[in-house]
Amino acid sequence: LDDAIHNVLETPATYPVLMRKPWNSKMTGLLSVNNITEFVYLVEQIINASLYRNKNIKNPSVVALVGPSGSGKTALSDSLCAMEQFENPKTYCTKPGDKHRYLTEEEFNAQDFFEKTRYAGIQYGTKMEDIEAVLAKGHFVVMPLDMCGAIAMKRHFPTVIVYVARDKELLIRDIIEQDYSIEEKTLRILSIDAEKRNRQICDYAVNNMDVGAATRELSDVLENNCL
């Protein structure tokens, strides 16, 4: 646990955790907390995920897609949600023009989100009632999340955490080709190796070299392991 980005990136620790401060708010992808209470809970969740991983999947449940920037989480989510039994819930963020519902920083901070995170300087949040509305239909909730968001989701709902894997060269190429600032591209690339470590505490992993094949693979996994 540290608030200095270079210390977190260079540590040999299996699960480095960033203590959020104003000077590191734009750092992307790392396990992060805002206070010691959140850190203690995060450690408990990592231990539980490592020791008591359950391969049985409740139907319906939340499918949390995690992985480095450029791994294709959003594309995989969109592909899954083209199928009848999968659905994206309503989510909120502080970036205008994004797929999420836009809120100003002031509006966002006034909302009651049960799960929220800051990614590359942008805040994202989810409301419990929006998740419940999708589950009530009998649909799987599909969400690209960072690891902290996925763990928070698992605290409240039946959740399967899926690591979306891709070759590092393709991750870097995808990040470079995106319409991000140089600073944001740099931060996303720097976080790749740290984010790859999170694969060990996920329930499943899918190789996303081809989104169609990854969609079929993950759909089959969910179907074959549902209770």
Where does each model-flagged region fall?
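Acidic, Mg2+-coordinating phosphoryl-transfer loop and its flanking beta/alpha structural elements
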Residues: 3-37
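Hydrophobic anchor at the beta1->P-loop junction of P-loop NTPases
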Residues: 65
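Conserved phosphate-donor/acceptor-positioning beta-strand/loop module used by diverse small-molecule
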Residues: 142-145, 155-176
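ATP-dependent small-molecule kinase phosphotransfer cores
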Residues: 87, 91-141, 147-148
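Walker A/P-loop
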Residues: 74
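P-loop (Walker A) phosphate-binding loop of NTP-binding proteins
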Residues: 68
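ATP-binding Walker
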Residues: 71
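Small-molecule kinase domains that catalyze NTP-dependent phosphoryl transfer to phosphate-bearing small molecules
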Residues: 5, 150, 180-221
